[in-house]
C-alpha cells in the first residue's frame, strides 16, 4: 500500500525540479524528462522511495529511536517545526550550528543554559535583575531559542535525521555521515544524492511539497511509536498511475533557486 498517491505529489508540485542548467548529473536516475527548461522528477520513483523511507523511520521509532528534522530555508522553517512537534521529534529550523552533532557535549551545555534562562524568565528572576544585565540575558535567551529551541529535550544524538535540501544543509549532512547517523532527505535535481541513505526525489523549494513529504515522515515516526497506521487511506484506494499519462504544466517561477 503506497504511503502517498501520484495525485497528491502532483498537486503539491513535488515533480518540479530546477532549471536544466542547474542540475547535478548524479540525479539523472530520478529524472523523468524536461519541460520548458525545467527538469521533471520521476514521481513513480518518488512514490516507491517515500515508501522505503517511511518503513525505515517507522522501524527506528518502533525501537525507541529519535528523529531530528532539519530545514533552515524559509519555506521549510514552519513545516519542520510543526511536524517535529506533532510527532515528538526534534528540529533545527533557524541555523545549523557547526558541531551540533559532532560536538554534541558542547551543544548540550548551551541547551542547558537555554533551559536555565527560560526558568529564570518563568519565575520572574529575570525581571529582578538590573536593566543592563536583564537586556543582555534576554538577547542571549532569544538567540538560544532560535537556534536550539527545537532540541531542548534531546538528550543524545538522534537515530535518524530528516533533511529538507541537503545542498543547503551540507554541514548537517557531513556531520551525520561522519557519525554514521542515517539520513532521509528531500533531494532536488540540483543536489548530490550520494551522501543520503534514503533519497526522496522531490521539489525542495515549494512549501506544499515540503509539507507533504515532511508530514509523511512524521506519520511514519508516529506509527512506529504508537503502533497505529498513519498512512493515507486515499493512497490505498487509488489505482497505480504512470507519469507518462499525466499532463504536466509549468507555472511561472518554477525551478528558480532561492537566493
From Swiss-Prot:
HAMAP family given in the database record: Ribosomal_uS2_B
CC terms in the record's Gene Ontology section: cytosolic small ribosomal subunit
GO MF term list: structural constituent of ribosome
Family to which the UniProt record says this protein belongs: Belongs to the universal ribosomal protein uS2 family.
Gene Ontology biological process terms, A to Z: translation
Gene name as annotated: rpsB
Transmembrane segments annotated in the record for this chain: none
Protein name from the UniProt record: Small ribosomal subunit protein uS2
Pfam families (UniProt xref): Ribosomal_S2
InterPro entries linked to this entry: Ribosomal_uS2, Ribosomal_uS2_bac/mit/plastid, Ribosomal_uS2_CS, Ribosomal_uS2_flav_dom_sf
Family annotation (Gene3D superfamilies): Glucose-6-phosphate isomerase like protein, domain 1, Helix hairpin bin
Keywords: Ribonucleoprotein, Ribosomal protein
Annotated source species: Fervidobacterium nodosum (strain ATCC 35602 / DSM 5306 / Rt17-B1)
Record SUPFAM superfamilies: Ribosomal protein S2 (SSF52313)
